[in-house]
Amino acid sequence: MKIKCSKSNLVKGVSIVSKAVPSKTTMPILECILIDATTDIIKLTANDMELGIQTEISGDIIDRGMIAIDAKIFSEIVRKLPDNEVTIETLDNLQTVITCEKAKFDIAGKPGDEFAYLPIIEKEDSIEISQFTLKEVIRQTIFSISDSESNKLMTGELFDISDNILKVVSLDGHRISIRKVPLKKSVADRKLVVPGKTLIEISKILSGEAENVVSISYTKNHIVFEFDNTIVVSRLIEGEYFRIDQMLSNDYETKVRINKKELLNCIDRATLLVKEGDKKPIIINIGDELMELKIKSQIGSMNEEIMITKEGKDLLIGFNPKFLIDALRVIDDEEVTIYLMNAKAPCFIKDDGESYIYLILPVNFNAAA
């Protein structure tokens, strides 16, 4: 095999597929990136058997062939080459020569046919959304997944396709995040649980342009994202996702309309008095036109008042400040509406059209104070 391409194209391609290289594996071939020049297109692939990424890069194929190269070494070499044309050539003994200007590297390769190719997916159905929308949906929900492997379903996000709407749900036992996106074409109802790791890595690759589309197709076991000459194939998480509909009540005793930035900044200031790992709640006292926020820790105490518009009853309630901050940070609206029932029931932050819903459980601030 012998190919030529620009350093910038190679760096971009390697950066994309490297996200599917496992940090630990018992199969050395999976620590490699496959360079496939057996057709008229140069393809780079990495695969950890749960997540696989393939991307095409432009360049010249002089001799067809393929080779697998250690991803870490290859990535570091490519990144530090001069900004010029790169030639990659494999010899009969699988030694791979990488040259750029006067720099020349000679490294060992592995047979390309030993590499774990991406599974060929018989696509059952597909949806299309813009890269901008998918990137935003991930940003606005991913913080609510659990990092505990003890409950695998909580480490993923539910993609619930129903009535021409994609509803994305994440939860960790303390909060639920929901984003709804209307779909342009009619597809059959389907529920898929996508690993959080997959979505985090996809979010890093997406350009985020509104005019660029992502095609999302799926089977019983896999989901495929196709965009910008890149294919991402991921295993789905098995099992039935949690039923949350009974938790999403529209009833409330107190409704608060408040400036999002003011509330976020106030809670952010309050957390200055909380050490990492210290579970001190922020206590919120809702009155007629004012919301008072208080926090007390070993470091000190703080209280602040914010103007609000309120409907319904006064309320005293406590929350983990981090959970409020996480939700408020990803809401783009200037004002937010918060719905509350009592000090023991979850609060809901949502817009009028319910394109986003954030459910956050309160904490017992008497016991925690």
Tell what function each PLM region has.
Residues 1-369:
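Structural preference for solvent-exposed beta-strand-turn elements
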